[in-house]
Amino acid sequence: MDTSKTSFFLFSVLCSLQLVGAARPGKQQRSCPTPCECEQEGMLVRVDCSDRALTSLPRNLSIFTSYLDLSMNNITNLPSNVMHNLHFLEELRLAGNDLTYIPKGAFAGLGSLKVLMLQNNLLRQVPSEALHNLRSLQSLRLDANHISYVPPSSFNGLFSLRHLWLDDNSLTEIPVRALESLSALQAMTLALNKIHHIPDYAFRNLSSLVVLHLHNNRIYSLGKKCFDGLHSLETLDLNYNNLDEFPAAIKTLKNLKELGFHSNNIKSIPEQAFIGNPSLITIHFYDNPIQHVGRSAFQHLPELRTLILNGASQITEFPDLTGTTSLESLTLTGAQLVYLPSAVCTQLPNLQVLDLSYNHIKDLPSFSGCQRLQKIDLRHNEVYEIRSTTFQQLVGLRSLDLAWNKIAVIHPNSFSSLPSLIKLDLSSNHLTSFPVTGLHGLTHLKLTGNSALQDLIPSEHFPKLRVMEMPYAYQCCAFAVCDNLKHSGQMNKDENSSADDFYRKDIGLLHLQDDRDFEDFLLDFEEDVKVLHSVQCTPSAGPFKPCDHLFGSWLTRTGVWLIVLLSFVCNALVIATVFRPLSYVPSIKLLIGLIAIMNTLMGLSSGVLATVDALTFGNFAQYGAWWESGVGCQITGFLSVFAAETSIFLLTVAALERGFSIKCTTKFETKSSFINVKLSIVFCFLLSIVIAVSPLLSGSTYGTSPLCFPLLFGDPSSMGFMVALVLLNSLCFLVMTIAYTKLYCSLEKGELENIWDCSMVKHIALLLFTNCILYCPVAFLSFSSLLNLTFISPEVNKSILLLIIPLPACLNPLLYILFNPHFKEDIGSLKNGDILWSRSRQTSLASVSSEDAEKQSCDSTQALVTFANSSISYDLPATSSSSSYQMTNNYKLSAVAFVPCH
């Protein structure tokens, strides 16, 4: 009664003053404090003094102030009766100041105050005396302070209080006595405190409370009757606490609609756990170490719309959902489910979203009874077969995710009755074929990770397809990706990553916990006409994943064939002359012969690629997947790496052998044993085998590209392998260069011409120079890729792989044939049937006639070196007794004839 009289009195005064204000306009505007901003609302004034660095309340506030914002200042105290004349003030904001204490009477006279904000201050307890008799107060914010104590009389007289914030403080218990007087309270948050226990009848007088937040505390136990009296409670948040047991006290909350107790330590959900909560709409209890769930736990919840159970790793049985007929979204991930009951759709006729990912489901029932299903997520399970009835007549299904299963069999009509399906993910399965019936409406298709799925997919079955991921780039050729690449170049990664966002359209079906995939399939087809005619397909085709020809140009094709033919012919001649029957092979010739064999293998690997290019000419996409994933490509890649590495290693041994040989000769020392050279050769072969096999043992293969060779860019493992090879080979070339530089520097001018077999020294030097020059582009591109320098086009990389790398296979034998006099001698001996090194068998060859020497020497002189009482410096075996050599181990000559250098 008194309140009505007071309100009538204030209304009368307001009307009178309004008439006065109408006669004297602008009066109130002039009374606005200097640092503040004021706004007229009829007779009343809104004053904004926020973030003005104030240390006290501004003066000259209008008595008609209805809104006063003093937040984000430096106010440290509020004197008593400082606002006693602000009878019309309805909202007062003091947040973000330095208030540590509010005295009694600080809010005296604020009979109309409805909203009081005191958050983000330094209060250590609720200012109980200051709050007394704020009868109109409806919202009180005390959050983000340091409050650890709430006096029992804190809220006395706050009969109209509807909302109370006490979160983010230091409370250790529920302020039971202080809350007893708040019978009109509708929403309260005590979150982000240090509360350990909720006692019985903690909220017994809060019969009007609708929302209660207790999350992010340290609650480990609940009284069995702690929620008694909360007859109107609809939302209860117990998330992020330390609860060990299911909160059985909720059984008294008959009107509860939203319940959250996720991220606790609850291990079990008992039978009929929610029997007293028939109004529940949403339950969140994921991220609990749940080991057991009663089969009847979720029965008879007719209003339940969403059920989320993530991370319940010990659940092995699908819950019985009898009576929970309104469920629209069911998420049960990270459990141990092995099967689904056949009656799942009978119990859930209104189900729209089903997420059973990360389980162990092996067999799927028929979902034909779930006519409202729009999204099914079954990724990361163990499903083997999709039958024709599994998804039959799901006319509303728009997204189906079956990735990371073991699906090997899909019935041809499995998707024939899914007219609304626009997103299908079957990536990382064991598919060998893919049915296309009924998928004409697809816009997103993912088949990547099915290595056995090598057939091309006809594009005419997917007229609306916009985004696709295939096992092989060649399968993108059918969707004109090659043609697009010719005009637009390689697609930008940022554009690819945002392409899905361009198509997304949220139709607001449900608020899901994870809407990343759900929104991805909801497309707007009418936004841009240009987008309708483009297909984003990955992995994209290109020079290393060609659609038409393995070799991109006729220049490359002709060059490869020329290298192959020359390597076969020239290396065959070198091998025939070096390894002639009944002839002794010295160490340096043995190395040259082995290098020729390796060069032949390199030519063979290039010949295989050239043959594949010829056989698949103009239609490589049809056979590309079969070729690069087959054994033939693996063998070709192995041979190319093995041959290339062995050639470099043998060339390194040859360079070192020449250096040691010259050193022994010039110092009249006995040569090192031939056994050391043989051991080095064996080591080279073993090291090359290890290098060539390592891509297979490390999990990667040579089939990353149809060239069957590790790429200089792209896949990190392949690029890392190539960079390691380049570093190793560069080290070999460095060792060879140092050895030969040291060799030439140690010899006096003209001394090399007097050394036996100096032609071999010069030949190895020529090989070193040629191979080093040819290897520079490979090293440069490898390090460019490592540094992400992309100024070199993939076409150039491809040409280097096809032409530069195998080029030594034909140049090495050509250099030997054209410039080494040993070849002329050996080919003549081979032609006439003579035995190699016949001069070493005849003791009469103490000297060579001047006429013969003149024919063989470019300077018409004979190079002779006399070794007095020293062993002959040929590379004969240490214990040779074969009659084919016709000489003894320590056979001595007074003078020896030598093959000239020129």
Swiss-Prot record:
<feature type="repeat" description="LRR 18">
    <location>
        <begin position="598"/>
        <end position="619"/>
    </location>
</feature>
<keyword id="KW-0807">Transducer</keyword>
<dbReference type="GO" id="GO:0016500">
    <property type="term" value="F:protein-hormone receptor activity"/>
</dbReference>
<feature type="repeat" description="LRR 14">
    <location>
        <begin position="348"/>
        <end position="372"/>
    </location>
</feature>
<feature type="disulfide bond">
    <location>
        <begin position="633"/>
        <end position="708"/>
    </location>
</feature>
<dbReference type="GO" id="GO:0090263">
    <property type="term" value="P:positive regulation of canonical Wnt signaling pathway"/>
</dbReference>
<feature type="disulfide bond">
    <location>
        <begin position="36"/>
        <end position="49"/>
    </location>
</feature>
<keyword id="KW-0297">G-protein coupled receptor</keyword>
<feature type="transmembrane region" description="Helical; Name=2">
    <location>
        <begin position="590"/>
        <end position="610"/>
    </location>
</feature>
<feature type="transmembrane region" description="Helical; Name=7">
    <location>
        <begin position="799"/>
        <end position="819"/>
    </location>
</feature>
<feature type="repeat" description="LRR 16">
    <location>
        <begin position="394"/>
        <end position="417"/>
    </location>
</feature>
<feature type="domain" description="LRRNT">
    <location>
        <begin position="32"/>
        <end position="61"/>
    </location>
</feature>
<feature type="topological domain" description="Extracellular">
    <location>
        <begin position="23"/>
        <end position="558"/>
    </location>
</feature>
<feature type="transmembrane region" description="Helical; Name=5">
    <location>
        <begin position="719"/>
        <end position="739"/>
    </location>
</feature>
<feature type="glycosylation site" description="N-linked (GlcNAc...) asparagine">
    <location>
        <position position="74"/>
    </location>
</feature>
<dbReference type="InterPro" id="IPR002131">
    <property type="entry name" value="Gphrmn_rcpt_fam"/>
</dbReference>
<dbReference type="InterPro" id="IPR001611">
    <property type="entry name" value="Leu-rich_rpt"/>
</dbReference>
<comment type="function">
    <text>Receptor for R-spondins that potentiates the canonical Wnt signaling pathway and acts as a stem cell marker of the intestinal epithelium and the hair follicle. Upon binding to R-spondins (RSPO1, RSPO2, RSPO3 or RSPO4), associates with phosphorylated LRP6 and frizzled receptors that are activated by extracellular Wnt receptors, triggering the canonical Wnt signaling pathway to increase expression of target genes. In contrast to classical G-protein coupled receptors, does not activate heterotrimeric G-proteins to transduce the signal.</text>
</comment>
<feature type="topological domain" description="Cytoplasmic">
    <location>
        <begin position="820"/>
        <end position="902"/>
    </location>
</feature>
<feature type="topological domain" description="Cytoplasmic">
    <location>
        <begin position="580"/>
        <end position="589"/>
    </location>
</feature>
<dbReference type="Pfam" id="PF00001">
    <property type="entry name" value="7tm_1"/>
</dbReference>
<feature type="repeat" description="LRR 10">
    <location>
        <begin position="254"/>
        <end position="276"/>
    </location>
</feature>
<dbReference type="InterPro" id="IPR003591">
    <property type="entry name" value="Leu-rich_rpt_typical-subtyp"/>
</dbReference>
<keyword id="KW-0325">Glycoprotein</keyword>
<feature type="repeat" description="LRR 5">
    <location>
        <begin position="134"/>
        <end position="157"/>
    </location>
</feature>
<dbReference type="GO" id="GO:0004888">
    <property type="term" value="F:transmembrane signaling receptor activity"/>
</dbReference>
<feature type="disulfide bond">
    <location>
        <begin position="345"/>
        <end position="370"/>
    </location>
</feature>
<dbReference type="Pfam" id="PF13516">
    <property type="entry name" value="LRR_6"/>
</dbReference>
<feature type="repeat" description="LRR 9">
    <location>
        <begin position="230"/>
        <end position="253"/>
    </location>
</feature>
<feature type="transmembrane region" description="Helical; Name=4">
    <location>
        <begin position="679"/>
        <end position="699"/>
    </location>
</feature>
<keyword id="KW-0812">Transmembrane</keyword>
<feature type="repeat" description="LRR 12">
    <location>
        <begin position="302"/>
        <end position="324"/>
    </location>
</feature>
<keyword id="KW-0732">Signal</keyword>
<dbReference type="GO" id="GO:0032588">
    <property type="term" value="C:trans-Golgi network membrane"/>
</dbReference>
<feature type="repeat" description="LRR 7">
    <location>
        <begin position="182"/>
        <end position="205"/>
    </location>
</feature>
<feature type="disulfide bond">
    <location>
        <begin position="32"/>
        <end position="38"/>
    </location>
</feature>
<feature type="repeat" description="LRR 1">
    <location>
        <begin position="41"/>
        <end position="61"/>
    </location>
</feature>
<keyword id="KW-0675">Receptor</keyword>
<feature type="repeat" description="LRR 11">
    <location>
        <begin position="278"/>
        <end position="300"/>
    </location>
</feature>
<feature type="topological domain" description="Cytoplasmic">
    <location>
        <begin position="740"/>
        <end position="763"/>
    </location>
</feature>
<keyword id="KW-0472">Membrane</keyword>
<feature type="topological domain" description="Extracellular">
    <location>
        <begin position="785"/>
        <end position="798"/>
    </location>
</feature>
